[in-house]
Amino acid sequence: MNTARELAQLANELLRCRETPDYPLALNGLQVDNRAPVTRIAAAVDCSQRTIRGAIDAGANLLVVHHGLFWGGLQSLTGAHLDRVRALLEHDVALYSAHLPLDAHETFGNSALLARELGLTPAGGFARYQTIFCGVQGTADLETTSLVTACDAFARRHGGQAIASAIDPGRRTRRWAVVTGAGINSDTMREAVDCGLDTIVTGEGPHWSAVDAAEKGL
């Protein structure tokens, strides 16, 4: 059986963690080690007391997350932060985190996998950040409402729901982009217009983005 360090090294190489830029002080890789060989792996978006407890209850001793414990440099071990670390250590659960390396990977990345889950075929990158693309884009020819329905069905399988800006009757999606997480800002909106996109699927967007999107043909 592999140790958490061995599995982390494999994941780091696969996701190209060392070469992939990320937000300042984001810590990608093995954040908390353990003692025993890894026998079961759990995965979640966030490292929270709930997801840690879920991993423990499932008998996992490696938790893989997108949003790890450490973001802003030095952090004191107090409050909820201490509770999370204590639970990992007391139950010998290792923690591995991959942020932008997991968003940006062209095969295993969040954006690429979500696009394929929705029946879309990525043909290039979108949402440029330094030397990488956090999202994907491509072409299609389908009713926008059918894409929203597919998004909603996917979201509901995971306890959520899809929210769409105003859609005119008969509107079709021909040039799309998928960027997971908080993928909409002034830069990505401008990039979408420059690329001639008509539809963007994202994890979350601010209120103003729905207003701007309608005025920009998105």
Segment roles from a protein language model:
Residues M1-L218:
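Hydrophobic structural segments
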